[in-house]
């Protein structure tokens, strides 16, 4: 005989993999393995009519997002680390050239202070982000083995997953601000009182670099988690649990970070032009990197908005049909 678990033959090449799974579950020999209600089946069929949402919530087995299973934590950490490390390198050379070189006997102190701060800040921030990611994955793994997982907690974890990029950006920004305060205070105790402009320059440069670096983790982590972690959280639960408002909130947040991605580099360039008129290298780096980065972020922003529109439309249609 033919097993219902085997892939059906003679299907169109563009037949969605999830539609096949839905129909196979309808024909399961054991009633306990079928859909629990007509409403649940209707929701699944509604999903099949929304290809974009379907690809996000139930990615094909050959999708590269599916193949990344098990690598979520290191990849999220890497997405956050790269822009922050690049911003840190730029900030280090900028501060050394425009602040430290003009202070007597400050080179050794600056090296020791920046080494200490970086050795604390980067592992702490990246470790915290990795831990938040791991919590989501652990809940997803527990849900796979426990068919009676807490519905309310499942909704909370789904919302946390959607905001993972926002949390990453907030953690990064907070650490840059703390570093902006720690650098001048540490330098003050190491070599004595600094000029007032040095305190302002340290704080301002670190805050601006932090705000520039914050947009990249938001878009990178949000897009990645939406396609890799979020599907795992809803695999064994009703994907209609989340109200459309959750997607709308994330769309509004995306606009905030998009504006930040374009505005902050422009403000940084303007500040450099006013304070250091001869610093053509820094202005050039910010101009080129800011432009390329903003264009890249805009592309991700457009894709993310389309993904969220599809999920919001699906959620709205399913919720309206259940009323």
What are these regions, as identified by a protein language model?
Residues 65-79, 155-181, 242-266:
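Loop-to-transmembrane boundary segments
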Residues 1-52:
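C-terminal lobe helix-coil module of Hanks-type protein kinase domains
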């Amino acid at each position: 005989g033919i097993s219902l678990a085997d892939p059906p033959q003679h299907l169109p090449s563009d037949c969605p993999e999830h539609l096949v799974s839905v129909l196979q579950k309808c024909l399961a020999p054991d009633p306990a393995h079928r859909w629990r209600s007509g409403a649940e089946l209707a929701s699944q069929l509604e999903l099949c009519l929304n290809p974009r949402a379907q690809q996000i919530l139930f990615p094909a087995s050959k999708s590269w997002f599916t193949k990344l299973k098990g690598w979520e934590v290191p990849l999220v950490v890497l997405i956050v680390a790269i822009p922050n490390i690049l911003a840190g390198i730029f900030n280090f050379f900028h501060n050394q050239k425009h602040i430290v070189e003009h202070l007597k006997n400050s080179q050794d102190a600056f090296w020791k202070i920046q080494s200490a701060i970086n050795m604390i800040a980067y592992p702490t921030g990246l470790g915290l982000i990795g831990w938040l990611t791991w919590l989501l994955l652990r809940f997803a793994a527990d849900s796979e083995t426990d068919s009676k997982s807490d519905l309310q907690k499942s909704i909370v974890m789904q919302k946390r997953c959607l905001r993972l990029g926002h949390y990453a950006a907030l953690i990064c920004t907070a650490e840059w601000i703390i570093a902006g305060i720690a650098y001048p205070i540490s330098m003050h105790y190491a070599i004595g009182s600094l000029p007032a402009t040095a305190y302002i320059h340290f704080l301002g440069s670190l805050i601006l670099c932090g705000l520039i670096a914050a947009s990249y983790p938001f878009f990178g982590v949000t897009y990645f988690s939406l396609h890799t972690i979020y599907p795992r959280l809803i695999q064994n639960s009703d994907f209609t649990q989340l109200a459309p408002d959750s997607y709308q909130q994330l769309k509004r947040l995306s606009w905030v970070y998009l504006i930040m991605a374009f505005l902050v580099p422009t403000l940084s360039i303007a500040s450099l032009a006013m304070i250091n008129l001869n610093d053509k290298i820094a202005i050039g780096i910010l101009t080129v990197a800011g432009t390329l980065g903003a264009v890249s972020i805009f592309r991700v922003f457009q894709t993310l908005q389309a993904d969220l529109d599809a999920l919001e439309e699906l959620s709205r249609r399913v919720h309206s049909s259940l009323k």
